[in-house]
Amino acid sequence: MACRSWVLGILLVLVGCAGPEVHQGEVTTVVIQPVQEQADIANEPFVLTGRLAVNARQHRFSGGIRWQHTGQSDEIYLFSPLGQIVAEIFRDQTGVRLVTSEPAIYRAQNAEYLTSQVLGWELPLAGMRFWVRGTHFPDTVAEKDLDKNRRTVAIRQDGWQVVYQNYYPAQEGMSVLPRLLEFSRPDVKMRLLVDQWQGETKSGDATGRKLP
């Protein structure tokens, strides 16, 4: 019963998060061309914890997520509603490794292929490490919708649409970070609710933000 209530809680929160939606008022659309230089944001570390709901054609997932990112690596843990690890995804310069709860270990050169083959839905890690921070992947063309405060409302890139439904309130010395996002393409829809961000402030000090 507790498990069912936990899952229902995830779905209710991910369907409608309290707080104002960001896509209100006038929106400006810009097209951004690829750049050869790697964006500095790619090297900025972060840790996020939250809840993820995935609805693919034949596969679904609802549970927790913990994602630790550095410029050289990613570690992503997916959890069941009861807190058990469902999958561990590791990326470094040698490729990507996915460990399931059996346990079984799978390897590939990119997370997109590996997750689609093992989990049944694609985790677009190359773009997602930028999208979760409200910006575009610099290697390919992106179409970006901005509100009057130049905050990202939506990104369309590499066949994906990312919609930013809620942000953390702005705080002095910190960048504005997304709170509730939706990633979609015709065969899959994902909703991510970030419960807590940890990273670096503009002054270089460690910081964390948590939902009220």
From Swiss-Prot:
Pfam families: LolB. A lipid is attached at C17 (S-diacylglycerol cysteine). GO terms for biological process: lipoprotein localization to outer membrane; protein transport. It comes from the Bacteria. A lipid is attached at C17 (N-palmitoyl cysteine). It is a lipid-anchor. CDD domains: LolB. GO terms for cellular component: cell outer membrane. Keywords: Cell outer membrane, Chaperone, Lipoprotein, Membrane, Palmitate, Protein transport, Signal, Transport. SUPFAM superfamilies: Prokaryotic lipoproteins and lipoprotein localization factors. Belongs to the LolB family. This is Outer-membrane lipoprotein LolB.
